[in-house]
Amino acid sequence: MKKILLMLLLCTPLLYMGCKAEPEWVNLIAQQEQEKGQEEEQEEADSEFKWANLADSCTTVLINQFMNKPKGTFWATPANESNNSGNIYWQQAHAMDVVIYSYQRIKDKNPSLADTYENYFKLWYDNKANNYDKGDTKYGTTGFGNRFTDDMCWICLTLIRLSEATGDDTYINMAKTVYDTQIITRAWEDEKGKGLPWKELSVDKTRNACTNAPGCLVAAKLYLKFQDAKYLTDAKTLCAYVNANILKSDYRVGEPPLTYTQGTFGEACRQLYHITQEQSYMAIAEQVISYAFTSTRCTNKGFLRDEGTDMNQSIFKAVLIPYVVNLVLDDAASGTVRNTLTLKLQDNAEALRKNMDRTLWPAMYCNYYWGSSFNSANIASMGAQASGASLMEGVARLEAAQAK
């Protein structure tokens, strides 16, 4: 094509002597060559693109902009700009989960960064994950006890993940203590079954999805580690309570359906399937997790919706994503479900990638809704950043699995 263009350009002065303007077809060929070059450059760039690189960027922003590094805990806004981070406890679990997945991904190729991450883990643990109730002995002496039962469940799940990632049982042993002394001791039973209350019994006995789903998962994980039958009994009991009283016929986990409870209950059922080999658990796991991506109650224009901007709502998707990836990577799950969820994750990741403004680095923030860009005139949210970074770490896990 370039040789043809050169010959045509050489002939042009002879054919069009005295004309100041280039013939239209010459300009058209030049334009086509330019567009072709741009397309080739874009194809080359796309072929070199790695989700792991974008995961690095998003997680780095989460750490550098939102972590109180001397304590290993997270602020609600960059450098605590809004001065409103004192009461965020359960959210600390899901921000740290992002760092844990990053740690697992990079530890072999970047030991120095892995050491830095391990130090953050210890600081987070030593500072009791920013627990505002840590000094109240009414909730035990571990420093992780809290008036909210669900908050303790979320924190215990991250303590368990820390042990799974590092091999240090300090964390899961603490989770066991908190569960044994402060979580399961609050469970109460009536004609509806036995379940966990949202808060301490003297304050609020409500048994909801956001407490019983993670409580069930904690019990299942403790059983896998310690092989104590009481944990399996607890997991089955709490799962049965959710099935009987909270799960809807269309697989909404409560009303309104929220991504974090859809994901957590799905993961609890998936774990129970692998413990018991009872197919009914896997069937529920597939349905409730799929609901988060296929129902318009949880999506907006095909992407996971903006569930709210406060610190309780903005971090919901950070809870969901790892459990979706776990299901996709589970060979025991339906191939159709796994393929569908893979495409949904990729679509959401591509949307977030498209809508992140890299020119704003290091303030390259994720929006609450991945189908649009973050407004840099607003104050960024740790919850939104953790959710976006969780998505990127998740698709990076899929990318690594596919490369094997």
Whereabouts are the PLM-identified features?
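Active-site cradle of extracellular carbohydrate-active enzymes
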Residues: 206-215, 219-223, 231-272
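Bacterial N-terminal signal peptides
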Residues: 7-14
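Bacterial Sec-dependent N-terminal signal peptides
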Residues: 15-53
